[in-house]
Amino acid sequence: MSKIRVLSVDDSALMRQIMTEIINSHSDMEMVATAPDPLVARDLIKKYNPDVLTLDVEMPRMDGIDFLEKLMRLRPMPVVMVSSLTGKGSEITLRALELGAVDFVTKPQLGIREGMLAYSEMIAEKIRHPSRAKLAAHTPLAAPDTLKAGPLLSSEKLLVIGASTGGTEAIRHVLQPLPLSSPGILITQHMPPGFTRSFAERLNKLCQISVKEAEDGERVPPGHAYIAPGDKHMELSRRRANYQIKIHDGPPVNRHRPSVDVLFHSVAKHAGRNAVGVILTGMGNDGAAGMLAMPIAGAWTIAQNEASCVVFGMPREAINMGGVSEVVDLSQVVSQQMLEKISAGQAIRI
């Protein structure tokens, strides 16, 4: 089996050296070349034909975003962004994901060499899964048609979503058409601290419903979506007749914090048949066990199909475990018919 061929673009000689060391330490991949900026990278891509590109966000001569936009239009390939953990860095990284980057790695703020080497296995996984993808010229997901507003839903109704790699754009596609009468929504997307706030703010500008980073103790009214903060678990709890968000620092589950399983298990316990669970694109198995618990408690569950996923790992694991009621294309995850059936309190059979 041939090795995954990686090309790294970063203006820092230290980062290029570290990335080379990390990639070459894994037997199934090799660093074929490195470049200090996108203009050099352009020629190296033609010469070495890499399977995956790692791309620094901020560089001289041409920044990573401008290069990514041209690359995805002219020669689409899996790209993993390398970003700083800053407010500006998170906004630029979200823009990169919108343009077609499949994932991102965050640079440690201190001890870059030690921190990056500690991330070695995670970086390898972020490269390994997208390397299998066959990308077409990138066309950003079009804004879906806005769904009609129905009667305001009972505060008992709930939509919960879990995602990882490729999830930022998939979540946007699900939330953007929702009317203000939609059920309350809880979302766990694997992201580090800082990024979740920027992600929520971006969605809030694009959507009719209100979207924000979740805070401990908040209620979950209709027409509002809450995103689990980076490095914190989010659970659903109850306070008398109302749903309430619980944010905590529990240990990572499935190597993740926030974890989709943590959210789904709590929703199965406290919402049961009033909930709809959705698992979107992502690698690994986080969410599979929690999704299995949801239909046992009476909920309806939906998995994104392989054709519309960036990485089919999380939906596949949930399907294989037996917790998925229905598998649909991303464009069909949320529909007018589904909202009407939730509103009527019917079991969902799309």
Swiss-Prot record:
<feature type="modified residue" description="4-aspartylphosphate">
    <location>
        <position position="56"/>
    </location>
</feature>
<dbReference type="InterPro" id="IPR035909">
    <property type="entry name" value="CheB_C"/>
</dbReference>
<keyword id="KW-0963">Cytoplasm</keyword>
<comment type="similarity">
    <text>Belongs to the CheB family.</text>
</comment>
<dbReference type="InterPro" id="IPR000673">
    <property type="entry name" value="Sig_transdc_resp-reg_Me-estase"/>
</dbReference>
<feature type="domain" description="CheB-type methylesterase">
    <location>
        <begin position="152"/>
        <end position="338"/>
    </location>
</feature>
<dbReference type="GO" id="GO:0000156">
    <property type="term" value="F:phosphorelay response regulator activity"/>
</dbReference>
<dbReference type="GO" id="GO:0008984">
    <property type="term" value="F:protein-glutamate methylesterase activity"/>
</dbReference>
<feature type="active site">
    <location>
        <position position="286"/>
    </location>
</feature>
<protein>
    <recommendedName>
        <fullName>Protein-glutamate methylesterase/protein-glutamine glutaminase</fullName>
        <ecNumber>3.1.1.61</ecNumber>
        <ecNumber>3.5.1.44</ecNumber>
    </recommendedName>
</protein>
<keyword id="KW-0378">Hydrolase</keyword>
<dbReference type="GO" id="GO:0005737">
    <property type="term" value="C:cytoplasm"/>
</dbReference>
<dbReference type="GO" id="GO:0006935">
    <property type="term" value="P:chemotaxis"/>
</dbReference>
<keyword id="KW-0145">Chemotaxis</keyword>
<feature type="active site">
    <location>
        <position position="190"/>
    </location>
</feature>
<keyword id="KW-0597">Phosphoprotein</keyword>
<dbReference type="InterPro" id="IPR001789">
    <property type="entry name" value="Sig_transdc_resp-reg_receiver"/>
</dbReference>
<dbReference type="Pfam" id="PF01339">
    <property type="entry name" value="CheB_methylest"/>
</dbReference>
<dbReference type="GO" id="GO:0050568">
    <property type="term" value="F:protein-glutamine glutaminase activity"/>
</dbReference>
<dbReference type="InterPro" id="IPR008248">
    <property type="entry name" value="CheB-like"/>
</dbReference>
<feature type="active site">
    <location>
        <position position="164"/>
    </location>
</feature>
<comment type="function">
    <text>Involved in chemotaxis. Part of a chemotaxis signal transduction system that modulates chemotaxis in response to various stimuli. Catalyzes the demethylation of specific methylglutamate residues introduced into the chemoreceptors (methyl-accepting chemotaxis proteins or MCP) by CheR. Also mediates the irreversible deamidation of specific glutamine residues to glutamic acid.</text>
</comment>
<dbReference type="Pfam" id="PF00072">
    <property type="entry name" value="Response_reg"/>
</dbReference>
<feature type="domain" description="Response regulatory">
    <location>
        <begin position="5"/>
        <end position="122"/>
    </location>
</feature>
<dbReference type="InterPro" id="IPR011006">
    <property type="entry name" value="CheY-like_superfamily"/>
</dbReference>
